[in-house]
Amino acid sequence: MENNLFKIHSDYKPTGDQPTAIDSIVKNIENGVKDQVLLGVTGSGKTFTIANVIERVQRPSLIIAPNKTLAAQLYSEYKKFFPENAVEYFVSYYDYYQPEAYIKTTDTYIEKDSSVNDEIDKLRNAATAALIHRRDVIIVASVSSIYGLGSPDTYRRMTIPIDKQTGISRKELMKRLIALRYDRNDVAFERGQFRIKGDVIDIYPSYMNNGYRLEYWGDDLEEISEINTLTGQKVKKNLERIVIYPATQYLTADDDKDRIIQEIKDDLKVEVKKFEDDKKLLEAQRLRQRTEYDLEMITEIGYCKGIENYSRYLAGKNPGDTPDTLFEYFPKDFLLFIDESHITVPQVRGMYNGDRARKESLVENGFRLKAALDNRPLRFEEFREKSNQTVFISATPGDFEVEVSDNHIAEQLIRPTGIVDPEIEIRPTKNQVDDLLDEIRKRAAKKERVLVTTLTKKIAEELTEYYIELGVKVKYMHSDIDTLERIEIIRALRKGEIDVIIGINLLREGLDIPEVSLVAIMEADKEGFLRSRRSLVQTIGRAARNVEGRVILYADIMTDSMKEAITETERRRKIQKEYNAYNHIDPKSIIKEIAEDLINLDYGIEEKKFENDKKVFRNKTDIEKEITKLEKKIKKLVEELDFEQAIILRDEMLKLKELLLEF
């Protein structure tokens, strides 16, 4: 295993309270502290701080972000900091994903439908390959990292080291490539394939941009080269040694195949008999037919569609055992950094239950063996058990993070640019729309941008239409806007094609925009999850990357949440201004280049939500029960800080209340 040192490449040195935060975190890691928090305000350089921590402690690191877009931003930043080291990207590789599901009430089976992004698949494979052969690895991941993967032991065991001196026969190489799930294709040469032309074998590894060429004389290996897969030209000649890693993490080793097939057959027999005993003959027939087809495929080629549902057998685990995940590919001393932990931790908490509910229906109706339930994300307690030493990163850490960190909290309130938290002004809600229009025009004249947050989608859309009629360059952004369109809207704002974004929850990805000098919060006194202390502090922070940053709260009363958010912001402003005065710092706005496509890695669209069949309400009682049910769900989502989903359910609940008036 290679053991290169982590080395930061940057023109900057830690400044402000970055050095103190770095020293504190490093000391806690070296002293074996399991959990700690980096409480860093927006624009304080938290990523640079963590990069310095990694360089100081020299340990492999996993950084988990709450979504693909933020993960892509972090990946780009860490790649620049560590060009000599293995910085990898591990997120869901689906451009589109409709999970397999069964709706019993309508007897509807929905087959898994997905589109895999080849580039992201390559990056995922590069991540696991890097962990096998080197220690200087940083992997930036989304919560996909807590989903089951194939066994790392099988993955390691099946890699193919090829040495020019000792060689490997053509027949043996082909056999092992097929076992590693490489397909032979002598016509179209794509990633995860190999081709044979006479005495030449070309391999296109699943984790590389280039490929390898092995030239034989009979069965004697004469030369190993790295090639351009498009032109076939040699990029590097006379390589002494290469290693071919698997094309996927889900593998069936030949010496395990008999065991795997027998275990599946045994479980199939038991589960079919149970259905037959319960007089569920359709389910019994369905399960037998589907599983026997999969068994035939595994027997012939070591693989079948949906093989992840048999991952428990592949890994040799017992029912209910914790699945192998990306965590198992790391050495035991790895570090875990959870970015935007106030969002990411609740996400991790909720993953298991959502996945379980969908799969139970498939198992109960004979579409899958019970083993499919073990192809799952980690439970939260399993996630915590697998996590080694953890640093939670957030401007507003959740109660859980603060509690488990036991006062090991490093505050980072000073920005390298000297920018202080924005001034907050409270204005009455009367005439708020026209008052805000004046403020928008002032900012637009100075080529500055504005973010506006409302309480509902309807208000966001109506306000946008009203301002467009008055000549304002504005767009709205809410949960109906898909990931790619969100990215384009943000990019348009940064480039000045629009001056204003109006949205509901402006805490989501990509909204740390230096050009924004005003954040307006409409109806700030409507106490609720979108106007909680934590939400307000986060939203206020959106104006903290511009030296002219201001926040207007439109409110007629002072809520507890407003008071707490304003008090916290004033505390930070005081510390920041004192630091600037003492060090003679003149604040400067953050300068951030506008990428051509903002994030060229984020081709992906978030997983499509699975919708139940529409309910039919026959009386007022049915509607009232559904409203009560939704209220409980909303409360739970708010506790988990899943505001986007809470908003969707809140809107559903409002429609039901309108429907109730019609009875």
From Swiss-Prot:
Transmembrane ranges, per UniProt, are none
Annotated residues that bind ATP are located at 40-47
Q: Where is this protein found?
A: Cytoplasm
The UVR domain extends over 624-659
| Function of the molecule | The UvrABC repair system catalyzes the recognition and processing of DNA lesions. A damage recognition complex composed of 2 UvrA and 2 UvrB subunits scans DNA for abnormalities. Upon binding of the UvrA(2)B(2) complex to a putative damaged site, the DNA wraps around one UvrB monomer. DNA wrap is dependent on ATP binding by UvrB and probably causes local melting of the DNA helix, facilitating insertion of UvrB beta-hairpin between the DNA strands. Then UvrB probes one DNA strand for the presence of a lesion.
Q: What is this protein's record name?
A: UvrABC system protein B
Kindly give the Pfam families that the UniProt entry links to this protein.
Helicase_C (PF00271), ResIII (PF04851), UVR (PF02151), UvrB (PF12344), UvrB_inter (PF17757)
The UniProt entry annotates the motif Beta-hairpin at: 93-116
Q: Which family does it belong to?
A: Belongs to the UvrB family.
List the lineage, top down. Bacteria, Fusobacteriati, Fusobacteriota, Fusobacteriia, Fusobacteriales
Q: Which InterPro entries match?
A: Helicase/UvrB_N (IPR006935), Helicase_ATP-bd (IPR014001), Helicase_C-like (IPR001650), P-loop_NTPase (IPR027417), UVR_dom (IPR001943), UVR_dom_sf (IPR036876), UvrB (IPR004807), UvrB_inter (IPR041471)
Keyword terms: ATP-binding, Cytoplasm, DNA damage, DNA excision, DNA repair, Excision nuclease, Nucleotide-binding, SOS response
Q: What is known of its domains?
A: The beta-hairpin motif is involved in DNA binding.
